[in-house]
Amino acid sequence: PERSTNCFGRREFSVNENERDWNDFESILKALDKFIKSGKIRYIGMSNETPYGLSKYLELSKNKNLPRMMSVQNPYSLVNRTYEVGMSEISIREKCGLLVYYPLAAGALSGKYKNGQMPKNSRMSLFKGWERMLNPLAMKAYEEYEKLAKENNITMVQLAQSFVNSRPFVTSNIIGASKLSQLKENIDSINIKLDDNVVREIDQVQSLIPN
């Protein structure tokens, strides 16, 4: 709305690119307000948003007495911590929490793609455009996180999920599973608490292999 944004395939903001078809922030909130008042929805949130967009919506809801965005659904994981730059502070200070999607980097943090493996019917084998998840730097990060998980007697999935769950700006973690065993492993991560040393080691990997 009202500007280019990196969502649904758009991966960068261009100040020189004019938007021909857009709806301004206020009209969007007014339309959503009608749905709330008619009983069709209870609360509103957004997805794939930027600090500018979130701030704008929160400002308008306060100044114009319009419904308030209650959550943001953006990607976040051990190998995608871009939410921490700008968005996390807004989430905490404005109490507009993150609903995490892709906490396992579309399955890459399960280790299923290591050593060149490409399981049949996996996301990477079925859909084009996911190669960025398997680039050399990302693969190196997966190796480091798998090593760290083994050192702490947990799986890489549990390391990845418990890290996401521990972040103060995260309200909910949206998990995906195609097998009961995967579901159990994801759910078990709720009971795992990473100590400060493990978090420091995670940050060390992030500093060496940033995303």
Predicted features and spans:
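Beta/alpha (TIM)-barrel catalytic core signal, keyed to glycine-rich beta->alpha loops juxtaposed to Asp/Glu
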Residues: E2-Q204, I209
